[in-house]
Amino acid sequence: MLSKELRAASQIVALVGLIFSLLMFIPWLAALGIGWRGGEPFLWSGLTSGFGCILILLATRGETPRISARFGIIVVNFLWWTIPLICALPFMLALPDLSTADAIFEATSGLTTTGATILSDLVNQPRPILLWRAIMQWIGGLGILSLGLILLPFLRVGGMQLFRMESSDRAEKPLPRLIEISKSIILIYLGLSGVCTLAYLAAGVAPFDSIAHAMTTVATGGFSTHDESLGYYQDSKVLWVAIVFMFLGGLPFSFFIALFFTRSLPKPDPQIYFFIVLILIASFIVIVVDLKLTEFSF
């Protein structure tokens, strides 16, 4: 039984890994089309990891176990051990001075939307590297297991247990069918990202920076294309775009699904209330501290 579960878990991990391998071709194609330097490492990384994932998929085809809590734990662990390694490959090839540990750290930080980085002088880093960091964080905001959730219907297995294992979203799912939830998640995430990109453009941010920052803003991650992050722009309009879309990105998917894809208002959700109260308290503390530091008073 355990061997069957491991084989099936390997199949799901390989499928997610194949998706990330295909995503590596985006920076390569962008570099090829625009003329950026540093695109080739993404071609070789995508081919290498993609070939390995295809071999695993062929070796484990036909494995469709019944989803259980134990199986969910196995998949979660497999994913978090393997996907950061795959995503670190372009860093290792494109930045030879970067250690393996640093490359894995950068990839893990992106996928977990932590936002910590070991890279500096970002403005002089290859554009494909900056784009890859944004893509990783964007997918990380969606959730690696949410990506697996979207793919699972094509493997003819259910996936809500996996979603609960990885996601902090505990709200009641407003739609009963997994495939409908998957479609809704994709549309919501793409919609938020697209509108955020347009908002950054309207605020005067350059096109590449707008796309990169939109992906990391909606993901609530924090990766930037500048060492100073959003402070580089010295513009309150840019900051307000980030504030609004980071707030929207922090709301559970179930809220947007209920709002846009059902005919009823979203049910009251304690986690949303707590989220808003936490933001208000934190904002008040920051304002008070800032006023004290600038020697102003109420």
Predicted regions and their residues:
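Membrane-proximal intracellular helices of multi-pass ion channels
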Residues: M1-F298
